[in-house]
Design a protein with these regions (language model features):
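Surface-exposed, charged secondary-structure patches
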Residues: 52-92
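Short amphipathic alpha-helical surface micro-motifs
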Residues: 42-49, 59-64, 93-97, 108-110
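Short, charged low-complexity intrinsically disordered segments located at boundaries
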Residues: 38-47, 70-76, 111
């Protein structure tokens, strides 16, 4: 239960950080491993290069369920299915809508893998994979 509580907070933090209009990963950096950070950062650079920015309103998380957990050596991986509702759109530099709808609630389905080293004194988990 404690893990899922933290996973829900991490999910909302990462989604809103990735989708805010500054095109930078800031508040969720410590929640991402290097590979995921680089993937997200590259996507944001490409969006920024096109002159686009995102607007998101996180409505809420409908569900978060542990789908699988696997221990490999000292590393524990937990796969979580999320269903959330957001309002999102991408705008260009002239504020014209490129995609999405700023007035429509959209349901999103994500499967994420969180990981932590069980021998580490750091209790925090990191996002290591997105499967959707």
């Amino acid at each position: 239960q404690e893990f899922l509580k933290g996973a829900k907070i991490a999910y909302e933090t990462i989604i809103t950080d990735f989708s805010d209009n500054d095109n930078k990963i800031t508040t969720s950096r410590s929640l991402l491993n290097a590979e995921i950070f680089n993937q997200f950062n590259e996507a944001l650079k490409q969006r920024s290069a096109r002159g686009h920015y995102a607007e998101i309103t996180f409505i809420g998380l409908n569900s978060a369920e542990i789908k699988e957990h696997k221990k490999i050596g000292n590393i524990l991986n937990v796969t979580v299915d999320f269903i959330a509702e957001v309002i999102t759109c991408i705008r260009d530099k002239d504020k014209k809508i490129v995609s999405g709808d700023p007035e429509k609630i959209k349901k999103i389905y994500d499967t994420w893998v969180f990981s932590r080293d069980t021998t580490s004194t750091n209790p925090n988990w990191q996002l290591v994979n997105t499967l959707t």
